[in-house]
Amino acid sequence: MPEQAVASASPHHPQAHGAGLAKLALGAIGVVYGDIGTSPLYAVKECVTLPHGVAPLAVNIYGVLSLIFWPITLVVSVKYLIFVMRADNDGEGGVLALMALVARPSAAAVTADESGAHRASTRTTWTGLRKTKMLLIVLGLFGAALLYGDGVITPAISVLSAVEGLEVATSAFSPFVVPITCVILVLLFAMQKRGTGGIGAVFGPVTVTWFVFIAAAGLPWIVRHPEILRAMNPIYGARFFILHRGHGFLVLGSVVLCVTGGEALYADMGHFGTRAIRLAWYTCVFPALLINYFGQGALLLERPEAAANPFYGLVSGAWLYPMVILATLATVVASQALISGAYSLTRQAVQLGYLPRVTIVHTSGQTEGQIYVPEVNWLLMVACVALVLGFRESSALADAYGIAVTGTMAITSMLFFFVARDLWKWGALRAGALLAVFLCFRSEEQTSELQSQ
């Protein structure tokens, strides 16, 4: 069975700087960060809502915020942006890129600091692979399957949850929730032929506006209760587990919602490049998310009764309805990250010989990684619409969503260990220590998700 393409560490965007880099960063905000950017809508709410959550007491609020702060920091800022995104397969990221790296017959050409444009490709057979590499290939393919599943579930649950917000205004909308969701999904997938660059140009400003609004909503509450920033101390997370024991472990099943979309950073690397994705995260997305999460915590310190919906509790009066409209747009945008990731995943699978040839349309003359795959696009659309028609409620999809996310991230961590040890020549202790930090946390969240079924 054909399997292999030799990897390269050269990005697709080496020339991006100045205005070009800013444009790519804007597109990355719209395409890559839509999913993780809408997590404040429900992450804190699920953590302080019974039966799986905890009561909105001060000690619990500090603990929950600590559990949210450190996963975002360790998983996104450290794991993906500092370490994992340094490993690419000819500029592409994602679980198949890692699989291709670890399955190479020779490790001579790839190091962590390599910047040359090594474009050679080779293929190998199953008989030429060691058993360990065969197992890693199977693991990588399973991770790819989970990412495809995530690409189907994310648009369905995001758009469905947004349209369900219409029921808050009046129950008269209830019969129209599913039909409206299906129409929006069809329109979303019909837009894909514009390419991620064109879509990013449309979605980018919407998502930037979203991040500005959620930061502006949270900041006044932090100013009123600056003591909430103490939750950055990990001791509060430790105390939370000591206090709640087994139930605190279950809360991790809700905490994982704050990093949904994290794998999209890596899967979409070929569309925008590492520099643009990192710039967008550190200058816009990361600060806005933290301000909003800590703002929700400060709100709950003063008004525990707001636990029913702490996100919308941050705003009131004339600002409530604009926020509802913007949130609806943002959740629709959130679908894009995994759709784009599915295109990149498909191209890699075709190049490695695991999928038959498909039509791959390059939608940008400047950015090689920006592609559109019609066959995958329409298959995803049919699958998403089928999920909506079958489940009809976003809550029915939530558990499968969390399992797909944590499973993919855990597999990425394991494959990264072998890249670091075998290709980058890190010591087993160094690579193993990093794996322990990443995989231990992901395994706890995976188990808590399964126990909450």
Feature-to-residue mapping (PLM):
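Short "domain-exit" segments at the C-terminal end of structured domains
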Residues: E449-Q453
